[in-house]
Design a protein with these regions (language model features):
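Conserved beta-strand-loop-beta-strand hairpin that lines the nucleotide-binding pocket
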Residues: 1-23, 69-165
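Conserved short strand/loop->alpha-helix "switch" segment adjacent to the catalytic nucleotide/phosphoryl-transfer site
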Residues: 38-62
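STAS-typified acidic loop motif
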Residues: 23-35
């Protein structure tokens, strides 16, 4: 519980723009992945998604964050990983960014080694569209998930203030 309290001070998740988007910056440490998933799940539950769609988004986003922490930031908690998600019309877009250079392009990313690289295949299979861009300034994974028109509706009141874990 103390770790969650410390994380909430360092990495406050933000639900903004009337609840149609989500943004969080987290320390690049593996122990923050579960809390990130919890916060993303909370935001997704406010959308009228089918359970399978929510599961796909959570799983793919979790894989992208794990890769950003392990590869982009080398699990260095002084580094950070940024996640932004937004609902626009009938698409949920999730963007995961880090400051490291661990992949050059989508094609390079989808060439697995014998023991690694399956998470990228998983992301490709779950997302309707996947792009991975590596630059000298970092790596960005962008995933688009097509959702039905009803997903444009939120349940409950929209949030406009940052929430703490």
């Amino acid at each position: 519980m103390a770790m969650l309290a410390a994380m909430s001070r360092e990495v406050p998740p933000v639900d903004r723009v009337g609840g149609s988007s989500f943004a969080v910056h987290l320390a690049a440490a593996p122990e923050h992945i579960a809390t990130f998933r919890h916060e993303l799940r909370h935001w997704l539950q406010g959308l009228t998604l089918k359970p399978a769609q929510m599961h796909d988004i959570l799983l793919a986003a979790g894989e992208a964050v794990t890769n950003a922490i392990e590869h982009g930031s080398r699990s260095d908690a002084t580094q950070s990983v940024s996640v932004e998600a937004a609902l626009h019309r009938e698409t949920v877009t999730v963007v995961v960014s880090d400051g490291g250079r661990w992949i050059e392009s989508t094609n390079a990313a989808l060439t697995p080694t014998q023991h690694r690289g399956r998470g990228l295949f998983l992301m490709e299979g779950l997302a309707d569209r996947l792009a991975i861009d590596g630059t000298d300034h970092g790596t960005r994974v962008t995933m688009h998930f097509d959702v039905p028109a009803a997903a444009g509706q939120r349940t409950g009141a929209p949030l406009s203030e940052p929430r703490e874990c």
